[in-house]
Structure formats: structure tokens, C-alpha cells
Design a protein with these regions (language model features):
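Core catalytic lobe of class I
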Residues: 1-142
């Protein structure tokens, strides 16, 4: 068996031009959760975008590159959750369906969407909730 070659590239996933068309079998990613967390101080970080629709447009650039580089039958695995925003930010409690919006964008690009896998993750609850909310900062019950 031939040895495999691995490269780790630190860059912007909105530009994957260094990868050839149809050269990747699997992409696993967890995009930023819109503006809920400061990931770093890089001004180009898409997690810093305040407008949700503008954020989705930037994510679409990523998905278009991913679609181009995947082999026929290749897979994109996207670990993402919906985004709950507090009343203090929008005057009312809102849930932005990030997972559904990504599915719609990817389907328009040409991806075949499979059923989502729901992960009931509560391990980070102590970081997300200060007032003991039973919903743990998530749009669904634990």
C-alpha cells in the first residue's frame, strides 16, 4: 500500500483555488456560528459579520468551492447548530435556522442533501447559560 501524504493548510476556506477540481473525497467542517462567538481577531473572519444574510453569502462561497473540489459522490459533513439570539439583541427571542439555510444553499449549488443527524449536545451548557435556563442556550429542549 502506498503511503498517504497529508498537508495542513491555514487559510481562508472561501478560496480553495489551490485544490484541483474533483480531488477530495470528504470534507468535514464546522463553520462559525454567525456572530455568537469571537473566534479570533482576524478582521476577515466570517464569524464577525453582523448581518445574517451577508454571513450566509460568505458561507456560500465556501460551499461552492467544496462542491467544485469534491469527487463525484464525495461527501460534505457540516457540523452546525441553529443560532439563538437573546431578546436584548433583537428585541425578541429569535432562532436563526442556520442548518436549514446551509441545506438550502447547498441544494441550490448541486449537493444532494441527506437526512440530518441530530446531536443533543449539552457538554458546554455551563459556558452558555448563566441564569440556569432549561434550554441551555439552544433552540431545542435537552
Amino acid at each position: 500500500m502506498e503511503p498517504t501524504v497529508h498537508r495542513l493548510i491555514n487559510g481562508d476556506s472561501r478560496d480553495l483555488s489551490f485544490l484541483s477540481d474533483g480531488s477530495v473525497h470528504l470534507v468535514v467542517t464546522s463553520p462559525p456560528y454567525w456572530n455568537l462567538k469571537r473566534y479570533n481577531e482576524n478582521p476577515d473572519q466570517i464569524g464577525h459579520i453582523q448581518d445574517y444574510e451577508a454571513f450566509l453569502l460568505e458561507l456560500e462561497k465556501v460551499w461552492r468551492h467544496v462542491y467544485r473540489i469534491l469527487v463525484p459522490g464525495g461527501r460534505l459533513v457540516c457540523v452546525v447548530g441553529d443560532v439563538c439570539v437573546a431578546r436584548r439583541d433583537f428585541g425578541r427571542h429569535l432562532v436563526f435556522p442556520l442548518h436549514a439555510d446551509i441545506c438550502v444553499i447547498c441544494r441550490r449549488i448541486g449537493f444532494d442533501n441527506l437526512n440530518p443527524i441530530i446531536w443533543h449536545k449539552i457538554a458546554n451548557a455551563s459556558y452558555e447559560v448563566e441564569n440556569g435556563s432549561k434550554f441551555l442556550g439552544k433552540p431545542y429542549e435537552p
